[in-house]
């Protein structure tokens, strides 16, 4: 009888790509895999209530540590693998002169305020980058300088950036790595001396301890051995999001090429 695994996937493109890699590995082990896509906090809530057996991927400790702790109030979790090493950032297109804008403080310069798009378009409210960005806006006094930060959808964020770049506008984009925009565009990270954007996290698979029995020790070791990278995820995600290739096929082909299934 085929064993079934329900995987909670944070509903952003690179999380879907990473989850597709893991799902293909699970299928190769003989599992039937159902993926449920949810926003950040809802995904962790489903892990907590047992609606999903595992979650891909948790950014620990800074971005999602608070959500993981909430789950572990009711059920221990097992961390598996190192999918990539993500971090949050604020960036500008490389055509914005570094002499003018190299760090967040530079956004307060009068000459920069005149040229920079005042809208900073983010993603959904539960994302680490959104929480961090709201704090950056506050601590640097950017609202007082005329900037506005808006949470929104992933597409809102990417479209705003790509539209600005098409018009060679100066624009700030709250992003992270891995992200497929880095594959196509040269985005310069701004220094953020107050340390409000978190640290370099570990992106891992989380498995509820009460579901560990579904796996053999060898299968657990296989899941724990999975190592991708920011560049690998960004590359695969670009193929899906901008080249229109089928996600599960893209990740399946990559796993075969790299001898992982």
Task: Name each model feature, range by range.
Residues 1-14, 26, 31-36, 117-121, ...:
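Short, well-ordered beta-strand elements
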Residues 12-13, 31-46, 148-160:
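Short helix-initiation/N-cap motifs at beta->coil->alpha
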Residues 21-29, 113-147, 253-260:
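Ligand-binding cleft/hinge of the Venus flytrap
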Residues 48-57, 117, 163-173:
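Alpha-to-beta junction loops
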Residues 66-79, 168, 180-194:
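Ligand-binding "clamshell"
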Residues 76-124:
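A conserved helix-loop-strand patch within extracytoplasmic ligand-binding domains
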Residues 88-98, 201-215:
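A bilobed periplasmic-binding-protein/Venus flytrap-type ligand-binding module shared by bacterial periplasmic
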Residues 136-150, 155-166, 174, 179, ...:
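An extracytoplasmic/periplasmic, membrane-proximal ligand-sensing/linker region
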